[in-house]
Protein backbone atom coordinates (compact mmCIF):
# COMPACT_ATOMS: atom_id res chain seq x y z
CA UNK A 1 0.00 0.00 0.00
CA UNK A 2 1.35 3.44 -0.93
CA UNK A 3 1.26 6.24 1.63
CA UNK A 4 0.49 9.71 0.37
CA UNK A 5 2.84 12.63 0.98
CA UNK A 6 0.22 14.39 3.06
CA UNK A 7 0.17 11.44 5.47
CA UNK A 8 3.96 11.43 5.60
CA UNK A 9 3.86 15.14 6.38
CA UNK A 10 1.31 14.61 9.13
CA UNK A 11 3.41 11.80 10.60
CA UNK A 12 6.46 14.04 10.79
CA UNK A 13 4.39 16.80 12.36
CA UNK A 14 2.99 14.40 14.96
CA UNK A 15 6.50 13.18 15.78
CA UNK A 16 7.59 16.77 16.28
CA UNK A 17 4.60 17.37 18.54
CA UNK A 18 5.37 14.19 20.49
CA UNK A 19 8.95 15.40 20.94
CA UNK A 20 8.20 18.98 21.90
CA UNK A 21 4.72 18.57 23.41
CA UNK A 22 2.90 21.88 23.47
CA UNK A 23 6.09 23.61 22.42
CA UNK A 24 5.28 23.29 18.73
CA UNK A 25 2.39 23.93 16.39
CA UNK A 26 2.15 22.60 12.87
CA UNK A 27 0.71 24.60 10.00
CA UNK A 28 0.80 24.64 6.21
CA UNK A 29 0.78 20.86 5.91
CA UNK A 30 0.49 19.87 2.28
CA UNK A 31 1.29 16.98 0.02
CA UNK A 32 0.33 15.32 -3.18
CA UNK A 33 -0.57 11.82 -4.25
CA UNK A 34 -0.42 9.92 -7.48
CA UNK A 35 -3.81 9.74 -9.16
CA UNK A 36 -5.71 6.56 -8.45
CA UNK A 37 -6.06 4.19 -11.37
CA UNK A 38 -9.68 3.48 -10.61
CA UNK A 39 -12.50 6.02 -10.25
CA UNK A 40 -10.77 8.94 -12.01
CA UNK A 41 -12.34 12.36 -11.52
CA UNK A 42 -13.66 13.89 -14.72
CA UNK A 43 -13.99 17.67 -14.75
CA UNK A 44 -16.97 19.18 -16.58
CA UNK A 45 -18.31 22.74 -16.62
CA UNK A 46 -21.42 21.59 -14.78
CA UNK A 47 -19.74 19.97 -11.84
CA UNK A 48 -16.45 21.87 -11.38
CA UNK A 49 -17.87 24.22 -8.72
CA UNK A 50 -19.50 21.38 -6.79
CA UNK A 51 -16.34 19.29 -6.83
CA UNK A 52 -14.24 22.25 -5.70
CA UNK A 53 -16.58 22.71 -2.72
CA UNK A 54 -17.04 19.10 -1.69
CA UNK A 55 -13.65 17.63 -2.55
CA UNK A 56 -11.33 20.49 -1.59
CA UNK A 57 -8.19 18.96 -0.17
CA UNK A 58 -9.32 15.43 -1.16
CA UNK A 59 -6.60 13.01 -2.19
CA UNK A 60 -8.26 12.22 -5.57
CA UNK A 61 -9.52 15.69 -6.49
CA UNK A 62 -8.04 17.19 -9.68
CA UNK A 63 -10.45 20.10 -10.09
CA UNK A 64 -8.35 22.46 -7.91
CA UNK A 65 -4.84 23.16 -9.24
CA UNK A 66 -1.77 22.90 -7.02
CA UNK A 67 -0.96 26.23 -5.37
CA UNK A 68 2.50 25.19 -4.12
CA UNK A 69 5.64 24.52 -6.19
CA UNK A 70 6.11 20.90 -7.17
CA UNK A 71 7.89 19.00 -4.38
CA UNK A 72 10.59 16.47 -4.92
CA UNK A 73 9.75 12.84 -4.26
CA UNK A 74 9.43 12.16 -0.53
CA UNK A 75 9.75 15.84 0.42
CA UNK A 76 7.37 17.18 3.05
CA UNK A 77 6.62 20.60 4.44
CA UNK A 78 5.77 21.38 8.06
CA UNK A 79 6.14 24.68 9.83
CA UNK A 80 7.34 24.20 13.42
CA UNK A 81 6.96 27.23 15.67
CA UNK A 82 9.21 27.11 18.74
CA UNK A 83 8.27 29.17 21.80
CA UNK A 84 10.57 31.89 23.03
CA UNK A 85 12.64 31.49 26.17
CA UNK A 86 10.40 33.85 28.14
CA UNK A 87 7.24 31.99 27.15
CA UNK A 88 8.81 28.60 27.88
CA UNK A 89 10.09 29.67 31.29
CA UNK A 90 6.71 31.18 32.12
CA UNK A 91 4.83 27.99 31.26
CA UNK A 92 7.22 25.70 33.16
CA UNK A 93 7.16 28.06 36.15
CA UNK A 94 3.36 28.11 36.11
CA UNK A 95 3.27 24.30 35.96
CA UNK A 96 5.55 24.02 38.97
CA UNK A 97 3.81 26.65 41.07
CA UNK A 98 0.42 25.02 40.44
CA UNK A 99 1.92 21.71 41.56
CA UNK A 100 3.38 23.31 44.69
CA UNK A 101 -0.01 24.81 45.52
CA UNK A 102 -1.51 21.31 45.50
CA UNK A 103 1.17 20.10 47.90
CA UNK A 104 0.65 23.08 50.21
CA UNK A 105 -3.10 22.39 50.44
CA UNK A 106 -2.50 18.76 51.44
CA UNK A 107 -1.16 17.09 54.56
CA UNK A 108 -0.51 13.85 52.72
CA UNK A 109 -0.22 11.07 52.08
CA UNK A 110 1.81 11.90 48.97
CA UNK A 111 2.47 9.61 46.03
CA UNK A 112 6.01 8.84 44.92
CA UNK A 113 5.44 10.95 41.79
CA UNK A 114 4.50 13.93 43.94
CA UNK A 115 7.67 13.48 45.96
CA UNK A 116 9.78 13.14 42.82
CA UNK A 117 7.95 16.15 41.41
CA UNK A 118 9.07 18.23 44.37
CA UNK A 119 12.67 17.15 43.77
CA UNK A 120 12.35 18.25 40.16
CA UNK A 121 11.00 21.63 41.19
CA UNK A 122 13.96 22.17 43.52
CA UNK A 123 16.33 21.16 40.72
CA UNK A 124 15.07 23.97 38.47
CA UNK A 125 13.68 26.61 40.84
CA UNK A 126 16.55 29.05 40.25
CA UNK A 127 16.55 29.02 36.46
CA UNK A 128 12.76 29.11 36.14
CA UNK A 129 12.35 31.63 38.98
CA UNK A 130 9.82 29.49 40.84
CA UNK A 131 8.19 31.27 43.79
CA UNK A 132 10.60 30.56 46.66
CA UNK A 133 7.85 31.00 49.26
CA UNK A 134 5.82 28.22 47.67
CA UNK A 135 8.92 26.02 47.45
CA UNK A 136 9.54 26.47 51.18
CA UNK A 137 5.90 25.98 52.22
CA UNK A 138 5.54 22.84 50.12
CA UNK A 139 8.88 21.60 51.47
CA UNK A 140 7.58 21.82 55.03
CA UNK A 141 4.56 19.67 54.10
CA UNK A 142 6.75 17.11 52.34
CA UNK A 143 9.24 16.93 55.23
CA UNK A 144 6.46 16.51 57.79
CA UNK A 145 4.99 13.64 55.77
CA UNK A 146 8.39 11.94 55.42
CA UNK A 147 8.98 12.17 59.17
CA UNK A 148 5.56 10.66 59.75
CA UNK A 149 6.41 7.56 57.70
CA UNK A 150 9.88 7.24 59.28
CA UNK A 151 12.16 9.05 56.80
CA UNK A 152 14.31 11.78 58.31
CA UNK A 153 16.98 14.24 57.22
CA UNK A 154 18.46 17.60 58.15
CA UNK A 155 16.46 19.22 55.33
CA UNK A 156 13.59 18.24 53.08
CA UNK A 157 16.08 17.59 50.27
CA UNK A 158 18.18 15.33 52.51
CA UNK A 159 15.09 13.44 53.68
CA UNK A 160 13.96 12.95 50.08
CA UNK A 161 17.43 11.71 49.16
CA UNK A 162 17.23 9.14 51.96
CA UNK A 163 13.81 8.03 50.73
CA UNK A 164 14.88 7.73 47.10
CA UNK A 165 17.98 5.70 48.03
CA UNK A 166 15.72 3.14 49.70
CA UNK A 167 13.29 3.11 46.76
CA UNK A 168 16.15 2.80 44.27
CA UNK A 169 17.65 -0.17 46.11
CA UNK A 170 14.31 -1.97 46.12
CA UNK A 171 13.60 -1.17 42.45
CA UNK A 172 17.02 -2.38 41.31
CA UNK A 173 16.87 -5.46 43.52
CA UNK A 174 20.09 -4.58 45.35
CA UNK A 175 18.64 -4.15 48.83
CA UNK A 176 19.62 -6.65 51.55
CA UNK A 177 17.19 -7.60 54.28
CA UNK A 178 19.68 -6.65 56.99
CA UNK A 179 20.09 -3.16 55.52
CA UNK A 180 16.40 -2.50 56.01
CA UNK A 181 16.31 -4.01 59.49
CA UNK A 182 15.60 -0.71 61.21
CA UNK A 183 12.62 0.12 59.00
CA UNK A 184 9.15 -0.65 60.30
CA UNK A 185 7.00 -3.16 58.48
CA UNK A 186 4.67 -0.33 57.51
CA UNK A 187 7.54 1.61 55.92
CA UNK A 188 8.81 -1.48 54.11
CA UNK A 189 5.35 -2.00 52.62
CA UNK A 190 5.15 1.64 51.58
CA UNK A 191 8.62 1.54 49.99
CA UNK A 192 7.58 -1.48 47.95
CA UNK A 193 4.49 0.40 46.79
CA UNK A 194 6.59 3.43 45.85
CA UNK A 195 8.90 1.18 43.85
CA UNK A 196 6.01 -0.50 42.04
CA UNK A 197 4.36 2.83 41.31
CA UNK A 198 7.56 4.17 39.76
CA UNK A 199 7.90 1.06 37.62
CA UNK A 200 4.27 1.34 36.54
CA UNK A 201 4.81 4.95 35.49
CA UNK A 202 7.94 4.11 33.53
CA UNK A 203 6.38 1.06 31.90
CA UNK A 204 3.65 3.37 30.67
CA UNK A 205 6.24 5.45 28.81
CA UNK A 206 8.29 2.45 27.67
CA UNK A 207 5.24 1.14 25.82
CA UNK A 208 4.53 4.47 24.13
CA UNK A 209 4.63 4.17 20.37
CA UNK A 210 7.71 5.71 18.81
CA UNK A 211 9.63 5.93 22.09
CA UNK A 212 12.94 4.74 20.63
CA UNK A 213 12.68 7.09 17.65
CA UNK A 214 11.90 9.92 20.03
CA UNK A 215 15.03 9.27 22.06
CA UNK A 216 17.10 9.05 18.91
CA UNK A 217 15.80 12.49 17.97
CA UNK A 218 16.82 13.77 21.39
CA UNK A 219 20.35 12.50 20.85
CA UNK A 220 20.46 14.34 17.53
CA UNK A 221 19.21 17.53 19.17
CA UNK A 222 21.86 17.19 21.87
CA UNK A 223 24.61 16.95 19.26
CA UNK A 224 23.24 19.97 17.41
CA UNK A 225 23.14 22.01 20.62
CA UNK A 226 26.81 21.24 21.25
CA UNK A 227 27.69 22.61 17.82
CA UNK A 228 25.52 25.71 18.21
CA UNK A 229 26.94 26.64 21.61
CA UNK A 230 30.48 26.02 20.36
CA UNK A 231 29.84 28.43 17.49
CA UNK A 232 29.00 31.30 19.86
CA UNK A 233 31.73 33.94 20.19
CA UNK A 234 32.46 33.83 23.00
CA UNK A 235 30.61 30.77 24.30
CA UNK A 236 29.85 30.51 28.01
CA UNK A 237 28.99 26.80 28.18
CA UNK A 238 31.43 24.06 27.24
CA UNK A 239 30.39 20.70 25.82
CA UNK A 240 31.01 19.23 29.27
CA UNK A 241 28.70 21.83 30.84
CA UNK A 242 25.90 21.08 28.39
CA UNK A 243 26.19 17.31 28.80
CA UNK A 244 26.32 17.77 32.57
CA UNK A 245 23.13 19.82 32.55
CA UNK A 246 21.44 17.17 30.41
CA UNK A 247 22.43 14.36 32.77
CA UNK A 248 19.08 12.81 33.65
CA UNK A 249 19.03 12.07 37.38
CA UNK A 250 17.84 8.66 38.43
CA UNK A 251 16.83 9.67 41.91
CA UNK A 252 18.30 7.41 44.57
CA UNK A 253 21.23 6.30 42.42
CA UNK A 254 24.76 7.49 43.19
CA UNK A 255 25.17 10.77 41.29
CA UNK A 256 26.60 14.25 41.51
CA UNK A 257 23.67 16.67 41.68
CA UNK A 258 26.09 19.60 41.85
CA UNK A 259 26.94 18.97 38.20
CA UNK A 260 23.71 20.35 36.75
CA UNK A 261 23.09 22.80 39.60
CA UNK A 262 26.39 24.50 38.76
CA UNK A 263 25.39 24.83 35.11
CA UNK A 264 21.94 26.05 36.12
CA UNK A 265 23.65 28.83 38.08
CA UNK A 266 25.83 29.72 35.10
CA UNK A 267 22.82 29.95 32.78
CA UNK A 268 20.86 31.98 35.33
CA UNK A 269 23.73 34.42 35.77
CA UNK A 270 24.06 34.87 32.03
CA UNK A 271 20.35 35.50 31.55
CA UNK A 272 20.34 38.05 34.37
CA UNK A 273 23.10 40.03 32.70
CA UNK A 274 22.23 42.85 30.34
CA UNK A 275 21.74 42.60 26.59
CA UNK A 276 21.49 38.83 26.13
CA UNK A 277 21.47 38.16 22.36
CA UNK A 278 18.33 36.64 20.88
CA UNK A 279 20.24 33.70 19.41
CA UNK A 280 21.62 32.83 22.85
CA UNK A 281 18.15 32.96 24.40
CA UNK A 282 16.92 30.60 21.68
CA UNK A 283 19.70 28.10 22.44
CA UNK A 284 19.02 28.24 26.18
CA UNK A 285 15.33 27.59 25.48
CA UNK A 286 16.28 24.48 23.46
CA UNK A 287 18.53 23.30 26.29
CA UNK A 288 15.89 23.76 28.99
CA UNK A 289 13.22 22.08 26.89
CA UNK A 290 15.41 19.08 26.04
CA UNK A 291 16.15 18.39 29.71
CA UNK A 292 12.47 18.73 30.58
CA UNK A 293 11.54 16.21 27.88
CA UNK A 294 14.09 13.72 29.17
CA UNK A 295 12.77 14.02 32.72
CA UNK A 296 9.18 13.67 31.54
CA UNK A 297 10.06 10.40 29.81
CA UNK A 298 11.23 8.90 33.09
CA UNK A 299 8.83 10.45 35.58
CA UNK A 300 5.98 11.94 33.58
CA UNK A 301 5.09 15.66 33.51
CA UNK A 302 5.14 17.37 36.91
CA UNK A 303 1.71 17.30 38.53
CA UNK A 304 0.08 14.90 36.06
CA UNK A 305 -2.55 12.47 37.30
CA UNK A 306 -3.20 10.18 34.34
CA UNK A 307 -0.74 7.38 35.07
CA UNK A 308 -0.97 4.10 36.93
CA UNK A 309 1.03 5.45 39.87
CA UNK A 310 -1.19 8.49 40.21
CA UNK A 311 -4.24 6.28 40.51
CA UNK A 312 -2.59 4.08 43.11
CA UNK A 313 -2.17 1.17 40.69
CA UNK A 314 1.15 -0.62 40.85
CA UNK A 315 2.77 -2.80 38.23
CA UNK A 316 1.18 -6.13 37.51
CA UNK A 317 3.36 -9.01 38.77
CA UNK A 318 2.84 -10.76 35.42
CA UNK A 319 4.12 -7.76 33.53
CA UNK A 320 7.89 -7.36 33.00
CA UNK A 321 9.13 -4.55 35.18
CA UNK A 322 10.65 -1.41 33.75
CA UNK A 323 13.95 -1.92 35.52
CA UNK A 324 14.29 -5.56 34.48
CA UNK A 325 13.71 -5.21 30.74
CA UNK A 326 16.93 -4.20 28.91
CA UNK A 327 15.02 -2.88 25.89
CA UNK A 328 12.75 -0.70 28.01
CA UNK A 329 12.68 3.06 27.73
CA UNK A 330 14.77 3.41 30.88
CA UNK A 331 17.66 1.39 29.47
CA UNK A 332 17.45 3.27 26.19
CA UNK A 333 17.36 6.74 27.73
CA UNK A 334 20.25 6.08 30.10
CA UNK A 335 22.18 4.43 27.27
CA UNK A 336 21.73 7.53 25.15
CA UNK A 337 22.74 9.81 28.02
CA UNK A 338 25.90 7.76 28.56
CA UNK A 339 26.71 7.96 24.85
CA UNK A 340 26.50 11.76 25.02
CA UNK A 341 29.75 12.02 26.95
Swiss-Prot record:
Name assigned to this protein: Adhesion protein Bd37
Q: Which residues form a coiled coil?
A: none
Output the Gene3D superfamilies linked to this UniProt entry.
Glycosylphosphatidylinositol-anchored merozoite surface protein (1.10.4170.10)
* Compositionally skewed regions (Polar residues) per UniProt: 60-75
Keyword Cytoplasm carried by entry: no
Q: What else is known?
A: Vaccinations with the recombinant proteins derived from Rouen 1987/Rouen87 or Weybridge 8843/W8843 strains protect gerbils against heterologous challenges with Rouen87, W8843, Y5, 6303E and 1705A isolates. Monoclonal antibodies MAbF4.2F8 raised against the protein derived from Rouen 1987/Rouen87 isolate protect against virulent challenges with Rouen87 and Weybridge 8843/W8843 isolates but not 6303E isolate.
List the transmembrane segments.
none
Query: Where is the protein situated, by its record's location annotation?
Result: Cell membrane; Secreted; Vesicle
Keyword annotations of the record:
Cell membrane, Disulfide bond, Glycoprotein, GPI-anchor, Lipoprotein, Membrane, Merozoite, Palmitate, Secreted, Signal
**Lipid-modified residues, GPI-anchor amidated serine kind:** 311
Which species is this UniProt entry from?
Answer: Babesia divergens
The region called Disordered is annotated at: 36-75
Q: What modifications follow translation?
A: The signal sequence is cleaved.
Any S-S bridges, and between which cysteines? 26-307
Residues that carry a glycan: 23, 30
Q: Which GO terms describe its cellular component?
A: extracellular region; plasma membrane; side of membrane; vesicle
The entry's propeptide annotation covers 312-341
Signal peptide limits: 1-21
Task: Tell me the Pfam families matching this sequence.
Answer: Antigen_Bd37
Q: Where is the composition biased (Low complexity)?
A: 49-59
Per the entry, what this protein does is: Binds to host erythrocytes.
Gene Ontology MF annotations: host cell surface binding
The annotated topology with respect to the bilayer is: Lipid-anchor; GPI-anchor
Q: What is the recorded phenotype of mutating residue 84 to A?
A: Reduces erythrocyte binding
Amino acid sequence: MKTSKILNTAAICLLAMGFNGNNVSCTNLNGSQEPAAANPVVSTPGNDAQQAGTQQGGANSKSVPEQQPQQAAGETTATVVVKTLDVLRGELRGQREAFLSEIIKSDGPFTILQLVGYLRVVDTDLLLKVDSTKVDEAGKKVKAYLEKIGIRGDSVEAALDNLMIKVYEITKGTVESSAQGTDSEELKTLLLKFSEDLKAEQELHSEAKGGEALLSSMKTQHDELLKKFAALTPTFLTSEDISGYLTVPEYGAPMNAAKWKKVEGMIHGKLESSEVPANLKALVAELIELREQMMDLLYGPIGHHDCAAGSGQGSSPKKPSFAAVPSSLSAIVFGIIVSMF
